[in-house]
């Protein structure tokens, strides 16, 4: 999962700073690298490994001055975690200057790369975004028109692809026809922002305009915003994990408050899996909203049982298991005064590998808790994701090879319960959701054809 940004602002000195602030607001979507590309007669770029605040300084904004800007924060799915895979990707061709920032993952990456290499194109990275950049360049040369080039690009790609792009001074945002990853547009003074989540618009003091609908592009050219249909969107497969974990709670995605959705997940979970206990607590930060919902519905008080060290990154999006193990030990500490001698309901948003959950339960027990009852605000994750979440194989997913009872014994809980799939969908409906979610990691049924997997397409 990554975060993408596109900015147009008539003040070319301000535009790259707005991109920086937007990326800072989307830092939760990727912490490995960050990059900004701007256009002012030609494309200038700065990319680096690390957090947004570690990559950029004031001198960079002078270098990046330009009215049209895109940006990216990354965590890797296709392509290793190294500088050459940091985005945006820039291409200079007969079609002009192109830059691409991509959130998603291509299922047919290898096939497309082989075809382009057979045509004589040279690749310098193992990122699927470089494939997208090369294809866009090829189609722009052949078509001479942005809309036609985007139509051909869409016909070529299989998987998830929400993107912001620079084609010379035009800023473009595009969302694939299934709408896997979010994208929205806002107004800032006399300019515009295109971004992965509405929280970035709020951070800039902007005005939300609308979500980019699946299969449509938002194109900003000469200061004018236009929405253009690129492909039919007959069905949707919005990533359910946006509402469970990835998105910031203060964001609104496709008209659904992420906070409301998570709160409803907690409430439905309390109805499905009640337990006698003294208080409800959360695994911070992503489990807090569901835990509050659980407490409200159950009538139990809510207390902090764990305190998070906010200078440690999100363990799930760290690329190497050994780093996740170390990060858990540094990430949270137990409030012994609250848990000692008491029965705790511990709520988390999800369990992927189980690294964090197992250690946290042990920490709470070691601190003197009488009982620990774990409640999970989503169903068991049993299948890999091929669309941009770092869950590559069933072997790394604890629920793919263990029953709920077995997982509870591994964690050392007194009880463990997950939200049902029906309960999850009910919660999203209560928050305003209507239709069309990708549930593949929970059901093993995929919305597009993936070799070796069952398809609902």
Curated annotation (Swiss-Prot):
Highest taxon of source: Archaea
GO biological process: 'de novo' IMP biosynthetic process; purine nucleobase biosynthetic process
Positions of the Glutamine amidotransferase type-2 domain: 2-223
Active site: 2 (nucleophile)
Enzyme Commission number, as recorded: 2.4.2.14
KW Oxidoreductase (keyword) present: no
Cofactor: Mg(2+); [4Fe-4S] cluster
Catalytic activity: 5-phospho-beta-D-ribosylamine + L-glutamate + diphosphate = 5-phospho-alpha-D-ribose 1-diphosphate + L-glutamine + H2O
Function field: Catalyzes the formation of phosphoribosylamine from phosphoribosylpyrophosphate (PRPP) and glutamine.
Family in the record: In the C-terminal section; belongs to the purine/pyrimidine phosphoribosyltransferase family.
PANTHER family named among the record's database cross-references: AMIDOPHOSPHORIBOSYLTRANSFERASE (PTHR11907)
Name assigned to this protein: Amidophosphoribosyltransferase
Organism: Archaeoglobus fulgidus (strain ATCC 49558 / DSM 4304 / JCM 9628 / NBRC 100126 / VC-16)
Encoding gene per record: purF
């Amino acid at each position: 999962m990554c975060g993408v940004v596109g900015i147009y602002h008539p003040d070319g000195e301000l535009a790259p700073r707005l991109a920086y602030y937007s990326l800072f607001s989307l830092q939760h979507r990727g912490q490995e690298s960050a990059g900004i590309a701007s256009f002012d007669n030609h494309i200038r770029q700065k990319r680096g490994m690390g957090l947004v605040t570690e990559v950029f300084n004031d001198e960079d904004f002078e270098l990046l001055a330009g009215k049209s800007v895109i940006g990216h924060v990354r965590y890797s799915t296709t392509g290793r975690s190294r500088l050459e895979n940091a985005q945006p990707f820039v291409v200079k061709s007969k079609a002009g200057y192109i830059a691409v920032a991509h959130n998603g993952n291509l299922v047919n990456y290898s096939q497309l790369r082989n075809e382009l290499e057979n045509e004589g194109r040279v690749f310098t990275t193992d990122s699927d975004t470089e494939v997208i950049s090369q294809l866009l360049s090829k189609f722009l040369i052949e078509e001479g028109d942005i809309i036609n080039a985007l139509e051909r690009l869409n016909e070529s790609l299989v998987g998830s692809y929400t993107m912001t792009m620079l084609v010379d001074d035009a800023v473009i945002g595009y969302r694939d026809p299934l709408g896997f990853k979010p994208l929205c547009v806002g107004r800032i003074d006399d300019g515009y922002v295109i971004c992965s989540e509405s929280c970035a618009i709020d951070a800039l003091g902007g005005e939300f305009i609308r979500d980019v609908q699946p299969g449509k592009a938002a194109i900003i050219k000469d200061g004018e915003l236009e929405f253009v249909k690129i492909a039919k969107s007959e069905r949707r497969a919005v990533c359910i994990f946006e509402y469970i974990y990835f998105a910031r709670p203060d964001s609104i995605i496709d008209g659904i408050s992420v906070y409301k959705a998570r709160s409803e997940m907690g409430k439905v979970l309390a109805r499905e899996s009640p337990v006698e206990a003294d208080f409800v607590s959360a695994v911070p930060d992503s489990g807090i909203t569901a835990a509050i919902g659980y407490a409200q519905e159950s009538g139990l008080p809510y207390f902090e049982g764990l305190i998070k060290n906010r200078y440690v990154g999100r363990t799930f999006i760290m690329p190497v298991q050994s780093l996740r193990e170390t990060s858990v030990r540094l990430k949270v500490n137990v409030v012994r005064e609250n848990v000692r001698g008491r029965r705790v309901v511990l709520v988390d948003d999800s369990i992927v590998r189980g690294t964090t959950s197992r250690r946290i339960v042990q920490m709470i027990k070691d601190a003197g808790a009488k009982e620990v009852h774990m409640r999970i605000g989503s169903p068991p994750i049993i299948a890999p994701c091929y669309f941009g979440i770092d869950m590559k194989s069933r072997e790394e997913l604890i629920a793919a090879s263990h029953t709920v009872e077995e997982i509870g014994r591994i964690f050392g809980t007194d009880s463990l319960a997950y939200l049902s799939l029906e309960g999850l969908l009910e919660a999203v409906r209560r928050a305003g959701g209507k239709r069309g979610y990708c549930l593949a990691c929970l059901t093993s049924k995929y919305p597009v054809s993936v070799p070796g997997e069952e398809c609902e397409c």
